[in-house]
Amino acid sequence: MKNYSKNATYLITVLLFSFVAMLLIIPSKCEAVSNDMQPLEARTADLVQQPRYIIDVPPRCPPGSKFVHKRCRVIVP
């Protein structure tokens, strides 16, 4: 009978130790995976092009000048 109780004590000790080890190791692994995924998610968000609504608004030029070829040009009479 003593042999069985010794084996049971050993088994319970091993199981408790492995359970504590899993509790310590698994959260650190999950944190490392989430840290690795974060830059990847940021990169994919940058790569996805969002629709841009471009509104053509003519720029204001000072009096006596006109907007020609993306610049304000002075009109000489």
Curated annotation (Swiss-Prot):
Extent of the signal sequence: 1-32
InterPro entries xrefs: Secapin
Primary site of residence: secreted
Gene Ontology CC entries for this record: extracellular region
S-S bonds: C61-C72
Keywords associated with the record: Disulfide bond, Secreted, Signal
Propiece residue ranges: 33-52
Compartments reported by the entry: Secreted
Domain of life: Eukaryota
Tissue specificity statement from the Swiss-Prot or TrEMBL entry: Expressed by the venom gland.
Family the UniProt entry places it in: Belongs to the secapin family.
Function: Nontoxic peptide.
Official protein name in the record: Secapin
